[in-house]
Amino acid sequence: MPSIEAVGAREILDSRGNPTVEVEVVLEDGTLGRAAVPSGASTGAFEAVELRDGDNRYGGKGVTKAVAAVIDRIGPAIMELEATEQRLLDATLIDLDGTPGKSALGANALLGVSLAVAKAAAASSGLPLFRYLGGPTAHLLPVPMMNILNGGAHADTNVDIQEFMIAPIGASTFAESLRWGAEVYHALKSVLKARGLATGVGDEGGFAPSLPTNREALDLIAEGIDKAGFALGTDIALALDVASTEFYADGSYTFEGNSRSAEYLSDYYAELVSAYPIVSIEDPLAEDDWDGWVALTERLGGKVQLVGDDLFVTNPERLARGIALKAANALLVKVNQIGTLTETLDAVNLAHRSGYRAMMSHRSGETEDTTIADLAVAVDCGQIKTGAPARSERVAKYNQLLRIEEELDDAARYAGAAAFPRRRQAG
């Protein structure tokens, strides 16, 4: 396999108009791998560290330091490594940084290199990225968890829950699931218009109206599903990302204007799961509320998927702690939370070995990079969260999954309802 011959980087813009890092790696046979790094709005305290400039450019959010780290520090250190030696490459990156949170060179610098090398190696091998990473058996297309109504940190409104998602579990193919999701999205827009509600969109393409309660959002989506001609619960299920760390402080949660306990929220989620066909709840409790997580998982873990995002931050060590405590039952996978491809794959493998599900995810600050679409298929996630069927940085991932399904042809399998074995059956 060709070795690494050149490493370059540049500062580009993400979907929120903030700078991010793009890395290009060229191998000795001339093949190129390019990767752009995403960035989150609601970030966990335990995530790997993005290196930002902190000067006057771009309000302090420039990434010229991270770009320089790629060119001046990382490039020379990995020159002539074989591109297929991903684990060795990533270990080299981690050692070169030398800090627990990757704060010296920046997780944004390390991840850009890690992904660009993998993409170059795939190109050199003549394989699509999903096949290069997942091997000959990778064929499972994920259920798109479409965030069609935004609140929390993704929208400037009074809705606490950050994401209200639809999951087209009854579709027979990924292409059909994408069509169903798009049709519900447009139906929801007409429902909102008829109510005189705002139809502007948030960071991830979902609508962002101001609503009196969080349950009102679920009712509006249910109406949109019905208007589009689909059956709630059998054709299309619901999912939430509460992002509760965002409204947690000093041991309590400020929810719908009141100070609430973990026990109150647990009762609230139990009511929602009973009233609506909700298959997944992400970050229902805060990232350091371990006792609350354990109690909630014991109570609801047999009925609904409970996803740790801020809780686990795609970190195998934090995930191992959660598994030992029986906190949550699923892992959200965000490559930039941990900073290398190898560590991401290790986290997913640990989840699967331990009976936890895994959901591949974008960030609110995205680019046209489609790596996570391939990665979702490569690691058999069965679920992907990459926004509404709107805004091209979101749709880019969905379109890549369409291409993958087409390439797999008869071998393609759509995860569908099987992705959520804990779901409450409709009826």
From Swiss-Prot:
Cofactor(s) annotated in UniProt = Mg(2+)
Which Gene3D superfamilies does UniProt cross-reference here?
A: Enolase-like C-terminal domain, Enolase-like, N-terminal domain
Q: Where in the cell is it found?
A: Cytoplasm; Secreted; Cell surface
* Residues annotated to bind (2R)-2-phosphoglycerate: 162, 334, 363-364, 385
| Cofactor detail note | Binds a second Mg(2+) ion via substrate during catalysis.
Q: Which InterPro entries match?
A: Enolase, Enolase-like_C_sf, Enolase-like_N, Enolase_C, Enolase_CS, Enolase_N
UniProt key word Protease: no
Show the PANTHER family listed in the entry. ENOLASE
- UniProt record similarity statement: Belongs to the enolase family.
Q: What is this protein called?
A: Enolase
